[in-house]
């Protein structure tokens, strides 16, 4: 069985502020290590549960955060930026039995984490699809479903886990922390890794019968930007329209068209 892990940093245990997520700062290194160790815990658990192949994609920033030496020997790591359409890298296809997300965070404008954001924190204020607030979990879970692959697991802040469970009923989750203003109440990294690894056998078992959620027949997307000039510029995307000084709308029936829109306007 084959599994694909998307790994981000803002949802890992103990990360609290933006400085810890940015590689230019001294406080980043421990968080990058924790990102790698949580991904490693998921991979170990998957292999122990019967997985034959595990691919981990480094999703944070430039995609060069995870120290490959910290991963299980038989895991594979996708590093860097492929410049594929969002959620449709050439590496990920319908041959996978399940997608898992580690270290994910709440959506832009949501309170689950002081570092809540959607893709680009300095640019995107809020993103909705068919009236529902979407973050990165929702974007990628639907991208997996578009490929016919179920999303089995997510770890990250409590807000993200709750939203993810509403998006994918039956989803396995490990909450790492809860947001409180510009602070977090966090589990210890050791406990989070134990919980992630311990849940992977259940994820492997679930993959044998799991089916991806049905995609909507139509997608109405609204992206609200921090700056009005970004909205104006992105409104020139074919099929997009400016519906307020800071909000661009886009409609499509095919989720692949939505992902292409995201690639060029986020």
Where would I find each of the regions flagged by the language model?
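Extreme N-terminal starter segment of soluble prokaryotic enzymes
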Residues: 1-4
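Short beta-strand segments
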Residues: 6-7, 57-58, 99-104, 154-155, ...
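Short catalytic helix/loop segments, enriched in acidic residues and glycine
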Residues: 20-44
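Flexible, glycine/proline-enriched loop segments at strand-loop-helix junctions
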Residues: 29-30, 123-134, 147-151, 183-190
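Glycine-rich nucleotide/cofactor/substrate-binding loop typically near the N-terminus or early
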Residues: 39-93
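Active-site glycine-rich loop that binds ribose-phosphate moieties when present
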Residues: 83-84, 121-147, 156-159
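Active-site rim beta-loop-alpha module in soluble metabolic enzymes
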Residues: 143-151, 155-204
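C-terminal accessory domains and tails appended to enzymatic cores
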Residues: 179, 192, 197-266
